[in-house]
From Swiss-Prot:
Residues 1-25 form the signal peptide. Disruption phenotype: Keeps the ability to penetrate maize epidermis and to grow intracellularly at sites of infection but fails to spread and induce tumors in infected leaves. Induction: Expression is highly up-regulated during all stages of pathogenic development. Expression is positively regulated by the unfolded protein response (UPR) signaling via the binding of CIB1 to the UPRE motif localized at the PIT1/PIT2 promoter. Secreted effector required for virulence. Functions as an inhibitor of a set of apoplastic maize papain-like cysteine proteases (PLCPs) including CP1A, CP1B, XCP2 and CP2, whose activity is directly linked with salicylic-acid-associated plant defenses. Acts as a substrate mimicking molecule for apoplastic PLCPs and its processing releases the embedded inhibitor peptide PID14, which in turn blocks PLCPs to modulate host immunity. This is Secreted effector PIT2. Interacts with host cysteine proteases CP1A, CP1B, XCP2 and CP2. Residues 46-59 are annotated as: PID14 protease inhibitor domain. It comes from Mycosarcoma maydis (Corn smut fungus). It comes from the Eukaryota.
């Protein structure tokens, strides 16, 4: 009898913990973690469909746009990185060789498109 009442008490405690967690999850506002346009590419479309955090289903279905606070990054904050300059790269490598005598450089062979070639 004691075992049965302990088992029932354990089940009730587990169910109430799940219920509390579910109620708290409903109170978290749904936010878009990644703001991408689905038409940009198929990969972006997958992310746009998938990355929604409401914590009832974590990675759940996309909610209506009326529910979501969409954050747009202004163009002024986006900084484009210039391509690497060979002189700057050579200076960096020489500096590293000076600081670390055992520094070694590894050069991967590439094709004209700039892709790394593993097998030639």
């Amino acid at each position: 009898m004691l075992f049965r009442s302990a088992f029932v008490l354990l089940i009730v405690a587990f169910a109430s913990a799940c219920l509390v967690q579910h109620v708290q999850a409903k109170q978290i506002p749904v936010r878009r973690s990644l703001s991408t346009d689905a038409s940009m590419s198929s990969a972006a479309g997958k992310l746009n469909r998938r990355w929604w955090f409401g914590f009832t289903g974590s990675l759940g279905k996309e909610p209506d746009n009326g529910q979501v606070q969409i954050k747009i990054i202004p163009d002024a904050l986006i900084i484009k990185n210039p391509p690497a300059n060979k002189d700057d790269l050579n200076k960096l490598i020489e500096n590293l060789k000076r600081k670390h005598p055992r520094f070694k450089t590894v050069v991967m062979p590439t094709d004209p498109n700039g892709d790394v070639v593993i097998w030639e």
